[in-house]
C-alpha cells in the first residue's frame, strides 16, 4: 500500500478489482484543505482511460508486477518497441507511456523498466534523471539577471520545459522525468 502522494507514473494500482496503469499524476494544495492528487489512469484489461482524484494520504493498492530492464529500440506506430539483454522485443502502446513518450528518442541509451501484467508489456518507467540535447531556445536576455531567470526550451523528442537563462541551443541538460524540470547543464 502506498499513499496517493507516493504513486508515480508507470505504477499499477488495483481499483474495483481491475489493474490500472498510472499515466499522469498532479498534486494540488490549497491553504486550508489537504492536498489532492489527480491521477490519469488506463485500465490494463479494457484499454479505457479515466481521471480520478484522491486525498494525498489515501492508501492505494499498488501491485508489484514483473519488471524487466530494457532499452528503446524503435517506434512502429502505435507501438514503442523495447529490447532486453537477450534481444527479446516487447511492444508497448504509445498511449500507455503517457508523458514518458516525450523523453524517448532514437539512439537513447537510458535503461528503462518495462512492466508486465499477465505476460503483456503494459508500461515503461524511465530513469528519474535523463540527459537530453536542447534543440531550440531563445538567446539569453541581456541585463535580466535578478533572481532565478528561466526561459522555454525544446529538447530532443519535442518536449518543452523551462531552463536556466544561460542554457543555449545544442547544450546537454539533465531533466527530472517525474516533474519535467530542468536540473542542470551537463
From Swiss-Prot:
- Record's InterPro entries? Elong-fact-P_C, NA-bd_OB-fold, Rib_uL2_dom2, Transl_elong_fac_P/YeiP, Transl_elong_KOW-like, Transl_elong_P/YeiP_cen, Transl_elongation_fac_P, Translation_prot_SH3-like_sf
Keyword Cytoplasm in record: yes
Supply one GO BP term.
Answer: peptide biosynthetic process
The record, for Pfam families, names: EFP, EFP_N, Elong-fact-P_C
Which first-to-last residue range defines the signal peptide? none
Pathway connected to this protein: Protein biosynthesis; polypeptide chain elongation
Q: What is this protein called?
A: Elongation factor P
> What organism is recorded for this protein?
Shewanella piezotolerans (strain WP3 / JCM 13877)
Q: Which gene encodes it?
A: efp
Amino acid at each position: 500500500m502506498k499513499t496517493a502522494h507516493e504513486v508515480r507514473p508507470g505504477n499499477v494500482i488495483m481499483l474495483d478489482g481491475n489493474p490500472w496503469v498510472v499515466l499522469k499524476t498532479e498534486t494540488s494544495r490549497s491553504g486550508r484543505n489537504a492536498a489532492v492528487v489527480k491521477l490519469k489512469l488506463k485500465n490494463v484489461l479494457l484499454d479505457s482511460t479515466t481521471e480520478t482524484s484522491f486525498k494525498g494520504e489515501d492508501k492505494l493498492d499498488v501491485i508489484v508486477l514483473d519488471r524487466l530492464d530494457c532499452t528503446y529500440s524503435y517506434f512502429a506506430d502505435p507501438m514503442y518497441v523495447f529490447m532486453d539483454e537477450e534481444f527479446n522485443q516487447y511492444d508497448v502502446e504509445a498511449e500507455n507511456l503517457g508523458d514518458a513518450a516525450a523523453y524517448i528518442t532514437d539512439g537513447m541509451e537510458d535503461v528503462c523498466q518495462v512492466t508486465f501484467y499477465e505476460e503483456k508489456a503494459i508500461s515503461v518507467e524511465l530513469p528519474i534523471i535523463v540527459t537530453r540535447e536542447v534543440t531550440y531556445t531563445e538567446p539569453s536576455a541581456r541585463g535580466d539577471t535578478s533572481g532565478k531567470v528561466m526561459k522555454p526550451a525544446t529538447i530532443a523528442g519535442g518536449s518543452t520545459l523551462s531552463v536556466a537563462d544561460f542554457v543555449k541551443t545544442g547544450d546537454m541538460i539533465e531533466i527530472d522525468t517525474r516533474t519535467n524540470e530542468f536540473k542542470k547543464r551537463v
